[in-house]
Each structure stands twice: as C-alpha cells, then as structure tokens.
Amino acid sequence: MRRSVHSLAAVAAVAALGLAACSGGTSSSSSADAEQTYGPGALPTVTEGKLTVATSDPAYSPWILNNDPASGEGYESAVIYALAEELGYSADNVQWVRATFESSITPGAKDWDLNIQQFSITDERRNAVNFTSPYYTTSEAIIAKAGTPAADAKSIADLKDVLIGVQAGTTSQQFASDTLEPGLSQKLQMFNSSDDTVLALQTGRVDAIVVDLPTAFNMIATQVDNGVIVGQFADAQDGENYGIVLPKGSKLTPTVSAAVDRLAESGKLDELHEKWLNEAQNVPILK
C-alpha cells in the first residue's frame, strides 16, 4: 500500500537535507533549483539536449506496460514523462536504454542520467549511487496458490513451515531474510530473476514467494495461475520508499529530486497512482 502524497512530501523534505552532500554541492538544493534553467541543453546530461533514462529488460507491468517504456504507459514510465515535462524536456527528448538491476546500483560510469526500476532507497545503496526523493512507497507481500496451506496464513507465525522463494539481490530478499527466515523451519529459496521465482511457485518448487505489493497484483493477474495475495507485511506508514537512481555525485540530483517533490506536492503522483497502481482490494497485514 502506498503512503499519501502529503507523507511522501514530508519524507522528501527530510531527504533533501542530504542531497547537497550526495551531489557534491555545498548550497541548499532548493536555492540551487530556484536558479536552475531547465530544458534541453540546459542540464548536464550524458547526451546534450536529451534526458537518457534506464530501466530493466524486460520491464514489467504495472510499472511499464508491454515492456515499452517509450509508450508512457505504466506507473514508472508515466512518472518519467511527467518528470521530464517538469524539467522542460518534451517526450521526444526522452531516450530510453536498458540496464540490469545490479549494474545500476554498482559504482562506476553510467551511460544514463536517470534509472527507474523499483529501487528501494537504502543506506547501503547510497554509498554507490544517488537517489531522488521517493516517488512511491510500498510494502512487501506474499503470494501462494489458492487452496494451499500457505494461502491460509493469517500471521507471520503461520508461515513457519511454508517454503518461501524470493529473487536474490532485491529488497524483497533482504526483507524475507531479516524478518521471515528466522522464524521459518526451512531456508529461503533464492532465484536469479523474477521469472525464475514465478516459475518456482508455478511448478511447486516453493509454496509461496515474496515480492512488492504492486508486482504481486500483476503476478496473480498475468503470471501465476490460481494465485492469491496472502497478505502484506507493512501498512502505508511503514513501507519502503522507491527513488529514482542517478550516478554517484551527479550534479542533476538536487534538480531532479526537487522536480519529484513538485510532482508529489501538486498531486500529480497521486493522479498517476490512481491510474496505474490502484489496488482493487484490501490486502490484510500479516504480523
């Protein structure tokens, strides 16, 4: 479930305090942003006059529809085009590239300005890359096949004997390792990709899988036969924040983060959420 735009804006205000250090600047991000000239050629992008944005390959709904980020369809694609407009770039001046999840949060030179693919903001990742203010807040969820013992769980304790799978290297894996595994009778099963994780559930190699809530809704609609969302593990105030990634030390960080803040404050992020991520049912919280 997502945090309200007002709460996101409050988080953004706190996050902004650290942006100057992240970007190498010494003045406040708000004053720097106020003096910034926007538009093609005005910002220090990797390709002059263009805003280059990376995402995963493939990219999944509801974040990007039909693996086509340039369509503007799906929450993250729509956020990028709203952000580009805020920065003075037309849709024609946005160009997309692909990057793996792990390479995107590894130190080193990048061929993109921004990267969006459900990156949770963590202190560890801040050592390697910069983040904008949050554009979305979610929680982890657990999926199982309907009619199985795993699907009947009403609490975390009920998951004790459930064999759980998760994609390695994700915050879902970190959450499951830290919060769930100590109380499980069996070790977590790790998989290299989202598709491998789903396949493990489909074929019975695991009883349930842990993913973020919007992905869970998409999986039970399009990938997992007879799948159900058993529950989520946090409410709207305790979920994890997603931020757009920039290369470490990027001079764009304060400007882009301030633009994300404006989208939150104006209600645009709420509007896009209602269009692309409006969950159709209430999901119980497992405690």
Question: Where on the chain are the PLM-derived regions?
Answer:
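Extended ligand-binding regions for polar small-molecule ligands
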Residues: 23, 77, 81-86, 170, ...
